[in-house]
Amino acid sequence: MDCKVVSLNEKDQFIPKIKSSDPVITGLFQYDAAQQTSFEKRMSKENNGREAALANVIREYMSDLKLSSEQELNIQHLANGSKVVIGGQQAGLFGGPLYTFHKIFSIITLSKELTDTHKQQVVPVFWIAGEDHDFDEVNHTFVYNENHGSLHKVKYHTMEMPETTVSRYYPDKAELKQTLKTMFIHMKETVHTQGLLEICDRIIDQYDSWTDMFKALLHETFKAYGVLFIDAQFEPLRKMEAPMFKKILKKHQLLDDAFRATQQRTQNQGLNAMIQTDTNVHLFLHDENMRQLVSYDGKHFKLNKTDKTYIKEEIINIAENQPELFSNNVVTRPLMEEWLFNTVAFVGGPSEIKYWAELKDVFELFDVEMPIVMPRLRITYLNDRIEKLLSKYNIPLEKVLVDGVEGERSKFIREQASHQFIEKVEGMIEQQRRLNKDLLDEVAGNQNNINLVNKNNEIHIQQYDYLLKRYLLNIERENDISMKQFREIQETLHPMGGLQERIWNPLQILNDFGTDVFKPSTYPPLSYTFDHIIIKP
């Protein structure tokens, strides 16, 4: 597999500004992610003393998996005080989208580089956001149908949308297998298809909860790298978090004030507010099989889906004795994560790192230092066919990744059309506009006639526009093969107007290039970069 790094002219300049150590952006974080001294400081930080307990919890969470020797060793390293690089993601259907895998590769790559540079073991940890309850965000994925040259949405259907956390959801296995079958119908048959399907079927048979199936697929893919997994909703982990839940409840108003103040500062720097929440407690409580947002009305803590209320002593008592009922929101999850782990760096997606930029004062309030916040690696897979099509139509890869192919497609259509025809129609449009101006001069002061002339002009312009559009549409139809090839490029490299990794599913890559494609023996060694990585399997 070949690997190269390309620099894109990105519309969103947040990550390029991190790369260049822009003082406005770096001021939103505790550390400058582009400076080596930041890593030296984090590597020398004193540990929090929770590492041995965490190692035991992670071992228990992964006890239903057959651990690799690398994972066994990393659990021991963690217990002995090794620091971590961490990142997380919701449990998407069949492991999707692709950037979930890329986030894990980011964690692996950075932890290895830090281990090599500082001669201290750094452990890669992936945090599964099993506490999330928005099932609509994880119950679907997309598959590319090569025969049609188009993407298809594949969705796991339920009679009722679950309102509990994803970790507490147990999907119907027959329905999930039907969803998997639908996905494979759209994918082309390769020598890898049957083996991949058997792996997925086995995972569905062997595991019961939504997040356990997700964990099993990730483990199958990344165990050789020594990645450790933990679910935010895992009950023994929640018991470790009880002291912090109590602190959050006691300081909830100060926490909310700190968050709002930091968010306002980011807006004053010209950034859009990323975290949208009305709560002033920033925790959820599981009650009546629903994950319910907690808020405080000045007297009571109340839940948003039932009429239950609690006084402070009651809700703190729940946090102490039943912490597994609590879960964090977007504000408190980073805080809890960093309170638990001895983190060198947190790896996040483009939106995630903007969330963290709104939390600096929250970390300071709880005397927890914000780690280095690193943008994850961004990766696109370029196969031989698409590379040949880019060459055929002389389209720069970097341009497609940012803008898609619509501009190049329109240019191609016009190149196939009669230039004289287009020029004459456009000339007629310009002539009509001049005529309209002359006629308006003739009827100046008479509003009825002005309206009449303008309406006449509008009709003529519409007719000429229609003529030109229909003519170009006919050219499209005459070049149907080329149009299909432009669609192939678009759906592969810029699907739904964005990067491939945001839409495509990892199973597509595994099916096309083999079930070992992401393994160390096959996948190219990566170097950490803020630019874009192109991999040619």
Curated annotation (Swiss-Prot):
GO molecular function: ligase activity
Domain of life: Bacteria
Pfam families: CC_BshC, Rossmann-like_BshC
Keyword Coiled coil annotated: yes
Coiled-coil stretches: 422-450
Assigned EC number: 6.-.-.-
Disulfide bridge partners, by residue number: none
Keyword terms: Coiled coil, Ligase
InterPro entries (alphabetical): Bacillithiol_biosynth_BshC, CC_BshC, Rossmann-like_BshC
NCBIfam families: thiol_BshC (TIGR03998)
Protein family membership: Belongs to the BshC family.
Known role: Involved in bacillithiol (BSH) biosynthesis. May catalyze the last step of the pathway, the addition of cysteine to glucosamine malate (GlcN-Mal) to generate BSH.
Protein name (Swiss-Prot/TrEMBL): Putative cysteine ligase BshC
